[in-house]
Curated annotation (Swiss-Prot):
This is Protein O-linked-mannose beta-1,2-N-acetylglucosaminyltransferase 1. One of its GO terms (cellular component) is membrane. It is a single-pass type II membrane protein. The GG-type lectin domain is known as the stem domain in POMGnT1. It mediates specific interaction with beta-linked N-acetylglucosamine moieties of O-glycosylated proteins. It also interacts with its product, N-acetyl-beta-D-glucosaminyl-(1->2)-O-alpha-D-mannosylprotein. It catalyses: 3-O-(alpha-D-mannosyl)-L-threonyl-[protein] + UDP-N-acetyl-alpha-D-glucosamine = 3-O-(N-acetyl-beta-D-glucosaminyl-(1->2)-alpha-D-mannosyl)-L-threonyl-[protein] + UDP + H(+). Disulfide bonds join C254-C281, C269-C279, C421-C490, C562-C596. Keywords: Disulfide bond, Glycosyltransferase, Golgi apparatus, Lectin, Manganese, Membrane, Metal-binding, Phosphoprotein, Signal-anchor, Transferase, Transmembrane, Transmembrane helix. SUPFAM superfamilies: Nucleotide-diphospho-sugar transferases (SSF53448). Its EC number is 2.4.1.-. Residues 634-660 are annotated as: Disordered. The modification Phosphoserine is found at S7.
Length: 660
């Protein structure tokens, strides 16, 4: 080891130095502080620039206001200012205001756009078939009405004609077809389209597509049409683009006297269209009614619940007839609207009535059922002292003596526990089977369509077990079930005090209305005094029925009851026929007889203990089911009950008809 010498090429050994944790932390902290100072400085500079820009904007605004004050424009009211804000743009240097309108028609979709805003779009399957109509205000361009008329179905063209005739002159009309709109487009409707200036509308063919824009009483602004090349196909989609020049606000407004009624009218007519003379500038129809008071009115303080949805034109017609009925109390009327729709509430406000909207619950018939429950509950909450409620629907005409009819009969509900309701509707009361407006019946079915409900019945029996939202049941069919009716009956008139005019609804269409509702008899005679009202009580009615059967002439049962000659050509007589009815629910012969009499035949209605009462050839006609009816004892031994066998069902035919 003495001769060892270090190599000069090797680095001398030294202990490795390590920075302490304190110095590392201090170094990082210094860097973070520097970054934070940089960010703070940037933020201050940004705020400074923002303040400078805002100060400049404020100074520019003050300068502009000062210049405007030196040369002020005439003062304008709020409505004019609003109209200015909403008015469409000017085209280039031209002072004329115009709208860009696009209209699309095809097999599965229609849409309308105004200045780039879609105001109609319908591409739902199996819905929206027919002619869609939109009405625009000619001064502002805002949508005043949207309707669809299924002119493939009967009578929808009549509804379209009525609507278009009620639109004020000058309004902008837009029409477009989805799927098919010509099958039931009859000559009257085609003539009206021709009068609007349309060339393609009157010639509209099977599955053609068509788009139209025009001014009522003015020029056509655009039209496109594509013919279907074959019965199995549709016309090509058409897209119509056109400019719509707008007129001055002066042309679009009426100048009525400044009264509370006219203020209501002005608010209504500035928003919606299709209501005819109520918005006439020269001679508007009244919106306040003064029917004669009803002496000793027993229903003056009975609340009236109007069950409504989104059918404002129906609601308008219904409320006009209701408010014209003798003995009406407008303060007792509440309109319940299923959904937050604007136009039905506008109709309610026009007449100065109370309207209540609520959120829809469930779907289809369950939604209607929940709407009824909510409305009935709210009615008795609004009027906690009421013992009864009158229940109406938005698609009913109300007879002039509707409240008189109820006033004369409502005591029966208080005095006879065997009664379920009083209804203004006779299911079998057609023009050829109803005759006597003073005559009343007891029936085992609940007709609805304008009826009186006892509060105790609703609160104690119906409300607690009302069908829940998940049950897709019709509320009226549920009320007719034996579990609810419990053997009780309803009082009805021979001649109805309500008329079901609606042809659009959940369980309604033009075909169904034509077959079962259009020819119902409706009383138009005021001041009818009902006859022998107290004879409608349970025991007294049995005495009356036995009296009628004892006096009735037995018809010749060898004749065909469907032939006109089955009843003699007399007037004022009472006749009786006996039909086979083996048990209480055996309605085979009755159903066939109802079919050939052209009255309600989808289910059994209007019967009392196996007996039906109606008129034929102005004769009182009684039909007794043997042996099920207790009145079978009145059948002479020599008479064989009539049996009518139903025709055999065609293969593939539906098992049951839809019922309302």
């Amino acid at each position: 080891m003495d001769d060892w010498k270090p190599s000069p090429l090797i680095k001398p050994f030294g202990a490795r130095k390590k920075r302490s944790w304190y110095l590392t932390w201090k170094y990082k902290l210094t860097n973070q502080r520097a970054l934070r100072r940089f960010c703070q400085t940037g933020a201050v500079l940004f705020l400074l620039v923002t303040v400078i820009v805002n100060i400049k904007l404020i100074l520019d605004t003050r300068r502009a206001i000062s210049e405007a004050n030196e040369d002020p424009e005439p003062e304008q009211d709020y409505d004019e200012a609003l109209g200015r804000l909403e008015s469409p743009r000017h085209r280039g240097s031209s002072p004329r205001r115009v709208l860009d309108v696009e209209v699309y028609s095809s097999r599965s979709k229609v849409y309308v756009a105004v200045d780039g805003t879609t105001v109609l779009e319908d591409e739902a399957r199996e819905q929206g078939r027919g002619i869609h109509v939109i009405v625009l205000n000619q001064a502002t361009g805002h949508v005043m009405a949207k309707r669809v008329f299924d002119t493939y179905s009967p009578h929808e063209d009549e509804a379209m004609v009525l609507f278009l005739n009620m639109v004020a002159p000058g309004r902008v009309l837009i029409c477009t077809v989805k799927d098919e709109g010509s099958f039931h487009l009859k000559d009257t409707a085609k003539a009206l389209l021709r009068s609007l200036g349309s060339q393609a509308g009157p010639a509209l063919g099977w599955r053609d597509t068509w788009a139209f824009v025009g001014r009522k009483g003015g020029p056509v602004l655009g039209e496109k049409h594509s013919k279907s090349p074959a019965l199995s196909s549709w016309g090509d989609p058409v897209l119509l683009k056109t400019d719509v020049p707008l007129s001055s606000a002066e042309e679009a407004e009426c100048h009525w006297a400044d009264t509370e009624l006219n203020r209501r009218r002005r608010r209504f007519c500035s928003k919606v269209e299709g209501y005819g003379s109520v918005c006439s500038c020269k001679d508007p129809t009244p919106i306040e009614f003064s029917p004669d008071p009803l002496p000793d009115n027993k229903v003056l303080n009975v609340p009236v619940a109007v069950i409504a949805g989104n059918r404002p034109n129906y609601l308008y017609r219904m409320l006009r007839s209701l408010l014209s009925a003798q003995g009406v109390s407008p303060q007792m009327i509440t309109v319940f609207i299923d959904g937050y729709y604007e136009e039905p509430m506008d109709v309610v406000a026009l007449f100065g009535l109370r309207g209540i909207q609520h959120t829809p619950i469930s779907i289809k018939n369950a939604r209607v059922s929940q709407h009824y429950k909510a409305s009935l509950t709210a009615t008795f909450n609004l009027f906690p002292e009421a013992k009864f409620a009158v229940v109406l629907e938005e698609d009913l005409d109300i007879a002039v003596d509707f409240f008189s009819f109820l006033s004369q009969s409502i005591h029966l509900l208080e005095e006879d526990d065997s009664l379920y309701c009083i209804s203004a509707w006779n299911d079998q009361g057609y023009e050829h089977t109803a005759e006597d407006p003073a005559l009343l019946y007891r029936v085992e079915t609940m007709p609805g369509l304008g009826w009186v409900l006892r509060k105790s019945l609703y609160k104690e029996e119906l409300e607690p077990k009302w069908p829940t939202p998940e049950k897709l049941w019709d509320w009226d069919m549920w009320m007719r079930m034996p579990e609810q009716r419990r053997g009780r009956e309803c009082i009805i008139p021979d001649v109805s005090r309500s008329y079901h005019f609606g042809i659009v609804g959940l369980n309604m269409n033009g075909y169904f209305h034509e077959a079962y509702f259009k020819k119902h008899k409706f009383n138009t005679v005021p001041g009818v005094q009902l006859r022998n009202v107290d004879s409608l009580k349970k025991e007294a009615y049995e005495v009356e029925i036995h009296r009628l059967l004892s006096e009735a002439e037995v018809l010749d049962h060898s004749k065909d009851p469907c032939e006109d000659s089955f009843l003699p050509d007399t007037e004022g007589h009472t006749y009786v026929a006996f039909i086979r009815m083996e048990k209480d629910d055996d309605f085979t012969t009755w159903t066939q007889l109802a079919k050939c009499l052209h009255i309600w035949d989808l289910d059994v209605r209007g019967n009392h203990r196996g007996l039906w009462r109606l008129f034929r050839k102005k004769n009182h006609f009684l039909v007794v089911g043997v042996p099920a009816s207790p009145y079978s004892v009145k059948k002479p031994p020599s008479v064989t009950p009539i049996f009518l066998e139903p025709p055999p069902k065609e293969e593939g035919a539906p098992g049951a008809a839809e019922q309302t």
